[in-house]
Amino acid sequence: MTRSARWLYGWLLLLPAAALLALFTHYPTLGTLWHSFFSTPRGERSPTFVGLENYRQLADDPIFWQALTNNLWYAAGTIPLSIALALAMAAWVNGKMAGRGLLRLAYFTPTILPMIAVANIWLFFYTPEYGLLEKLTGALGLPAHNWLGSKSTALGALMAVAVWKEAGFFMIFYLAALQQMSPHLAEAAAIEGASRWYFFRRVTFPLLMPTTLFVLVNAVINAFRLVDHIVVMTRGGPDNATALLLYYIYEIGFRFWDPMYGAALTMVLLALLGMAALAQFWFLERRVHYQ
């Protein structure tokens, strides 16, 4: 087979996936960008080109800035906690112990539960006076508290749900990476007198950097795409304390019927995710390949 024939054969193999990617990813993105420069049609009034008016409206929108701030706090809390917990769980269940399979299943179970089911389970835990959390705090003599109804604790309560659900999912990737490591590394470190913590810090964790990069990218995406739990548990309240960017976009587009403004919000979210992804690859790619 000639070089040109191999080149053509390779592109023919890529063509179905490339067509689907263009149809369901690139085309909607370009369509959203185009619509963000138009006004929303009202009644008999057709959409008109308004340029950057939607983006100027966005810059003056206090709810957008609150949702962005909430999302940044949510990401700052859930991403490191879920990754650290996943790594700790993977390191634990990777060792030899009785009931290791059941423990792995217990850790992974929250991941396979439907999002709405998880939200309802935790909604019961947080129910004032009757919820499981209230019963536990009451037994300790602590005062009753409305966890989802208080601005100071509502976002933290949602973060706990996300960490509980995502840590088991990330654990699977870390566990797979740990199982691929040669046991001779640990044996050599033990012979040299290295402590378990030193071996983890200097050998295990650097070898896990490719997995950590993959997990981190997924964790960032998950932190900016939460809608289900908010709809079921708080609906963005109290006083927009739990409104995140994607939920605010959902409300603008489907509750207030302003899809063009929602398109502008979506482009801002895509830009934020793009910058976050570039920063992750730029900083972590060097550590992954030891540059």
Predicted regions and their residues:
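Short, Lys/Arg-rich, polar N-terminal cytosolic tail immediately upstream
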Residues: 1-5
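A structural signal for multi-pass alpha-helical bundles of membrane permease subunits
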Residues: 6-291
